[in-house]
């Protein structure tokens, strides 16, 4: 049976950094939930801004059900035939509950967080269509996402929380400690 790590957290917290670390160091198969939505937006000929991605996600969820993307993630993991997988960017309650129900005790949900100012500095360095231009824009985007996805409640589903406000070495050490504690390494 697969060992799966699910990553939750606000934008710029370090979810993708952790996912890439697990993929590169330990061979975890990586599924990025946002990339699934970006693929669908591009197939429709749309520029994948944050607003467009939210609209595309909403369209597919209303058409195919709240668990559409979670089931797609499970399918990708199963098709990969990998023993270990990491899911980057779970946003909705179903994104967490459906894989938890499917993988049972073989899934570990980690919340990666950091202070807002640090997260804004991190995302300011990104070259993506959906990156906010100002700190106020960033905070407004975050308020919108917390409201749309009910993130406060989603984040409560985490088994462990990591505050990522230091360097990469500290982050990786903390990730390794937690994964060892749960028998995932």
Please provide the spans of the model-predicted regions:
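P-loop (Walker A) phosphate-binding loop of NTP-binding proteins
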Residues: 10
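ATP-dependent small-molecule kinase phosphotransfer cores
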Residues: 28-98, 136
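ATP-dependent NMP and nucleoside kinases share a basic, alpha-helical "lid"
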Residues: 76-128
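Hydrophobic positions on the alpha1 helix immediately C-terminal to the Walker A/P-loop
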Residues: 18
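Conserved lysine of the Walker
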Residues: 15
């Amino acid at each position: 049976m697969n060992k799966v790590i699910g990553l939750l957290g606000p934008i710029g917290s370090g979810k993708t950094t952790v996912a890439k670390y697990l993929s590169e160091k330990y061979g975890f198969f990586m599924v990025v939930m946002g990339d699934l939505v970006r693929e669908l937006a591009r197939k429709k000929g749309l520029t994948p801004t944050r607003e467009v991605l939210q609209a595309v996600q909403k369209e597919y969820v209303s058409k195919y059900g709240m668990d559409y993307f979670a089931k797609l993630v499970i399918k990708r993991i199963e098709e990969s035939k990998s023993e270990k997988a990491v899911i980057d960017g779970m946003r909705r309650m179903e994104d967490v509950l459906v894989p938890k129900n499917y993988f049972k005790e073989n899934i570990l949900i980690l919340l990666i967080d950091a202070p807002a100012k640090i997260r804004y500095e991190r995302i300011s360095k990104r070259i993506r269509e959906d990156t906010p231009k100002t700190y106020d824009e960033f905070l407004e985007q975050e308020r919108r996402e917390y409201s749309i996805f009910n993130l406060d409640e989603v984040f409560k589903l985490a088994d462990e929380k990591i505050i990522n406000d230091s360097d990469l070495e500290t982050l990786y050490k903390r990730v390794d400690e937690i994964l060892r504690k749960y028998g995932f390494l």
